[in-house]
Structures are given as C-alpha cells and as structure tokens.
Swiss-Prot record:
EC nos: 2.7.1.11
Biological role stated in the UniProt entry: Catalyzes the phosphorylation of D-fructose 6-phosphate to fructose 1,6-bisphosphate by ATP, the first committing step of glycolysis.
Known pathway: Carbohydrate degradation; glycolysis; D-glyceraldehyde 3-phosphate and glycerone phosphate from D-glucose: step 3/4
Binding site for ADP: 21-25, 154, 185-187, 213-215
Active site: residue positions: 127 (proton acceptor)
Entry GO MF terms: 6-phosphofructokinase activity; AMP binding; ATP binding; fructose-6-phosphate binding; identical protein binding; metal ion binding; monosaccharide binding
Reaction(s) catalysed by this chain's protein: beta-D-fructose 6-phosphate + ATP = beta-D-fructose 1,6-bisphosphate + ADP + H(+)
Annotated protein name in UniProt: ATP-dependent 6-phosphofructokinase
Amino acids binding Mg(2+): 103
Length: 319
C-alpha cells in the first residue's frame, strides 16, 4: 500500500477536520501518500480528488465542519455508483480509503472493501448513534453548544416565568437530549427510545411552579416530535405560558472541544495503522477509554446503547 484517500460523508460534525489532520499526518509519517476526496462519495464518483500534504492540514485541529466538504450520495448504494467510485480510485492509484461519517458512510466503506479497496470507518456524527463506540466525533461539542444555548434560554424563561420546550438534534437517538437535559436542569427529558407521558410532565411542571420555581424546561429529542407539536400537547393539560425553541444546525458548528479533538486524533491514527496492517472493512471506536475496532457488518446487527440511567438521574434531580 502506497497511497490512501480520505473522505467525509453525511452530516458534518465538529472534529471531522481534526480526524482528517490525524489521518494525513500519521499516514505521511509512515511513508504513505495521501489524497483528499471532496464531497464524500459524490466527489469520489466525480473524481474530485487532490493530494494532501502535512502543511495542508496544519490549521485544521480547531476548525469545525469539514474542509473536504460533505454530501449525501444515496446512489453509492447501487453497484453502478460503486463501480464508478472504484474506477476513480484506480485512476488515481489509491489503494485504501478512510471514511469519516455516520452509519450511511459505513455502508460505503464496506462496499469499497468488498471491491478490494480496504476501507476504515470513523464515527463522525453529532448524534452519537453508532454502536461499539462510547462517543462519536462531534457529540461532545454538540452537547456543549446545546448546553450553552439552553443556559441562555433559561435566563429569559426565568425573567418571564415561562416554560420552554427545546428541540435538540440526534435523529432517533436521545443521547444529546439526555446529557444536555441533565446538565441544564431540565424538568423533563423526552427521547425516542423510552415511553413518556405528557400529562405526567405537565403535572411535574405545575408542582415546580407551585413550589416557587420561576421557569420550566423540557428537552425533546428531534426524533420524538417538534417542539411546537410537544407544546400543543402540553397545553392540553394546563394553562402554561410556554414557548417552543428549535436549536437546529447550530449544534453541528462551533470549535471542537478538547474531547472531540483528542478522540478524532486517536481514531484517525488507529485507522492508518489498521490499513498498514492490511486490514479493511472495520469501524474504529472508543470503548471504556480504549481505542477498538469491529467488523462494520457487526455494527449493522447491533444498535447503539444509550446511558438511560441519565433519565432516572434527571427525574430524581428535578423533584
């Protein structure tokens, strides 16, 4: 193996650039040539491929987003798209690929490996919904961003004795909602993975108001319903002065935290070393503080396990 490619795919996440930096520098330090692939699998098929040197990534560790750009390209699930991508890899003499992204990106990495081009998947998504890793690249930063925003919302909520329903990202995973809800002192946290009772939440908010609390906060994961929809449901059980707020795409931005920078660096380095060992079709993650790797196929048969004890903790803290 002499030459590797790097691409970022799907939704962007803080720390992706730090991962690109790590892959590039470790690969070059081990005598490999590195090529960046712009716009994910769409750019691979289009041949948007260029050489990377250490100086090209020197400024990236603290920069959010992805300087390789990203795009969703469902056509890569089809044989025709895969063969077009393989043709571009052959044309540029690329022997292996590091793919940074979510579960859809892992499917692409697996297909490249099946076609004879070893590929390693790195978990780059704020959703933290990838099995066999305790954290994904971007998750910690997204939580910090959401916490900072909700802290500000609490300021205005207290000034007007209002209840705020706040939507956070995460698709069908409630990890951001749980972690941020506990950190922000939410009265309730609502996630897709666990049942909830709007009437019970309404009663809890009433009790808090009666005890003298000057604000209310419900954190709702986007996979449950919109903040407006939840607000409408809540109003059926009480005459609340309530507002809905959607944090949205701000959670994908912001300077990566220390945790995300270090995680991205560790996983990027491990990806290169796995490729140097001739391995492919693997997903790299962090488990109990140690860098691990699993067959990508295993991820498709497993589901992410959230820290649902946080819900009980929050229920105890909000009484």
């Amino acid at each position: 193996m002499k030459r590797i490619g790097i691409l970022t795919s799907g939704g962007d996440a803080p720390g992706m650039n730090a991962a690109v930096r790590a892959v590039t520098r470790v690969a070059i330090a081990n005598g490999l040539e590195v090529f960046g692939i712009r716009y994910g699998f769409a750019g691979l098929v289009a041949g948007d491929i260029f050489p990377l040197e250490s100086e090209d990534v020197a400024h990236l560790i603290n920069v959010s987003g992805t300087f390789l750009y990203s795009a969703r390209y469902p056509e890569f699930a089809e044989e025709e798209g895969q063969l077009a991508g393989i043709e571009q890899l052959k044309k540029h003499g690329i022997d292996a690929v590091v793919v940074i992204g979510g579960d859809g990106s892992y499917h692409g990495a697996l297909q490249l490996t099946r076609h004879g081009f070893n590929s390693i998947g790195l978990p780059g998504t704020i959703d933290n919904d990838i099995p066999y890793t305790d954290a994904t690249i971007g998750y910690d930063t997204a939580c910090m961003t959401a916490m900072d925003a909700i802290d500000k919302i609490r300021d205005t909520a207290s000034s007007h004795h209002r209840v705020f329903i706040v939507n956070v990202m995460g698709r069908n995973c409630g990890d951001i909602a749980m972690r941020v809800g506990v950190a922000c002192g939410a009265d309730a946290i609502v996630i897709p993975e666990r049942p909830y009772d709007v009437e019970e939440i309404a009663n809890r908010l009433k009790q808090a108001q009666e005890s003298g609390k000057d604000h209310g906060l419900v954190v709702v994961a986007e996979g449950v319903m919109t903040a407006d929809q939840f607000m409408a449901e809540l109003k059926k059980y009480g005459d609340f002065d309530v507002r809905a707020n959607v944090l949205g795409h701000m959670q994908r931005g912001g300077t990566p935290t220390v945790s995300d920078r270090v995680l991205a660096s560790k996983l990027g380095s491990e990806a290169v070393h796995l490729l140097l060992e001739g391995k492919g079709g693997l997903a790299v993650g962090i488990e109990n503080g140690k860098v691990t790797s699993h067959d990508i196929l295993d991820l498709f048969d497993e589901s992410h396990r959230g820290d649902y004890d946080l819900l009980k903790l929050n229920a105890d803290l909000s009484r």
